[in-house]
Amino acid sequence: MSTPSGSNPLPMADKLEAKGRIASIKFDYVKNGQPKAGSTHGVSYHNFTEWFDLNHTCDEHILSVKCYYDDGEIQGLVIKTNIRTSAYMGYNIGTTFTLEVKGKKIVGFHGSFDKNLTSLGAYFAPLSPAK
């Protein structure tokens, strides 16, 4: 799972879809000003989906992702942007780790999956200067 080749990584996570104990994850994005549906990573066998959309009209961007890890799998996620914090996606059980670098924003993701998401990492870029 990585930034699509040739795309602008800044709007990478326009829309995040997470299912179950994070059985699958999907990132829709914008390429050359056009919305693109990302690929689903993992297995989509759960009946519910949780979405998190970024609002680019107010320059919303992801600052961090808190991950819950247990039994070899990502159990849940909480996304923090420069404007708000998401509700729990998945389950808030297990050991936590946070994808975050001070003074930077998340512009893409990478990871691995088996039956569920087993690892998640992030690509970072400097924050844009305030206008």
From Swiss-Prot:
Tissue/organ expression: Expressed in the vascular and surrounding tissues in cotyledons. Detected in root apical meristems.
Keywords annotated in UniProt: Lectin
GO molecular function, one term: carbohydrate binding
Family annotation (PROSITE patterns): JACALIN_LECTIN (PS51752)
All residue ranges annotated as the Jacalin-type lectin domain in the record: 1-126
GO BP term, pick one: defense response to virus
Keyword Disulfide bond among record annotations: no
InterPro entries linked: Jacalin-like_lectin_dom (IPR001229), Jacalin-like_lectin_dom_plant (IPR033734), Jacalin-like_lectin_dom_sf (IPR036404)
Family per record: Belongs to the jacalin lectin family.
Protein name per UniProt: Jacalin-related lectin 15
Organism: Arabidopsis thaliana (Mouse-ear cress)
